Amino acid sequence: MRIFISAGEPSGDLHAANLIRSLRTVYPEARFDGFGGERMAAAGASLLYPLVDLAVMWFLNVFFNLVTFIRLIFVADRFFRDEKPDAVVLIDYPGLHWWIARRAKARGIPVFYFVPPQIWAWAGWRVKKVRKYVDEVLCSLPFEPAWYHARGVSQAVYVGHPYFDELADRPLDAPFLAEQIRRDGSLVAILPGSRTQEVTRNLPDMVRAAAKLSRQCPGVRFAVACLHERHQRLAQAIVTETMAREAAPPELTIEVYTGRTPELIRLARVAWAVSGSVGLELMVEALPSVVLYKIKRFDLWVARWFIKSKYISLVNLLADAVVFPEYLSWRDASDELARWAHLWLGDQDARSRATEPLVKLRHQVAQPGASDRAASHIAAWLSDHHQAASAPALTVSAAYRGPHDQDLEKKKLAGESKPERR
């Protein structure tokens, strides 16, 4: 068994690594190749390109990397032609992945989409590509299968969000927790995102908010959680520059950490976070949070033509209500960040109102096992279609068609349907 997996973002790299481990329980001798990051490689995948290093967002940034994306499409196509993998698994990252799916289908290779892109929120027309190029959609959100089914995609199943697998298995640093607990002052966790562009755009507002909040609530502590050391250096530079520009109070200290996101979320009384899967962790910890996503003014103008969802936060989408106050804007949001934090730190009733829906939602959706369920669905699909391909009454090509096409093929072979004229 040989499986090609592609993930283009840090969160996708994490989900791919967990899926590889789950697939190994089904296929112990399987080989994994693809595009991804360090976590995929650590799980045993052979990387054809470190796609996670190219994580980009919004229109112009994609355009500037267009040559690289085109080259990767040809790299994938050559791999499909020469190595003939048994399956292709794609994780989020629309755009490039539609082209990879197209090339895989052209080579007769089944395509699975794990943690599909949120096309229901901003690009509903792309469901046509799902119908055409994807054999099974492994949905991470409970309302997604119904959305796909209503648009003619019958091969969509809910497996759960793989982020909960990571939360269930991830140990916390007990000495770090103990040392932090001994310190005075409530902690505000600052989570500026996993992409360099996100950190650059969102962290300045968060630092300005920290300066404003520290004037209102002396003694409050702040800590920035970074994905890796490169982001830590960038974040430290932004913190230093922004504090100097804002004439921050001399007692204000903003510490910057790498690899301490779960610990800081566990310790914090409030969080300021960039929109993304980290919101699910904030939900699990029932931590009152404000969600921010800063984009350029032009990008926001273009996005408003496409965005169909009411919310940008996964938690708000799951609740279908504003559980986390959220701000998608090009404007300075530091006043709003400081205002909500001040409310939750000083008003216990307001804090309780913020945590109650999080606890309820956690019980409803925070179920681990998504990676195992996805692996089981992939294995079952491949087994069923391998048997169908081996049956003497069916052609091999029928194994890689949609359900409607396979039914029609059976009818033709049984004499129930006349062949079309040519």
Model-predicted regions and their roles:
Residues M1-R422:
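Nucleotide-activated sugar donor-binding and catalytic core shared by glycosyltransferases
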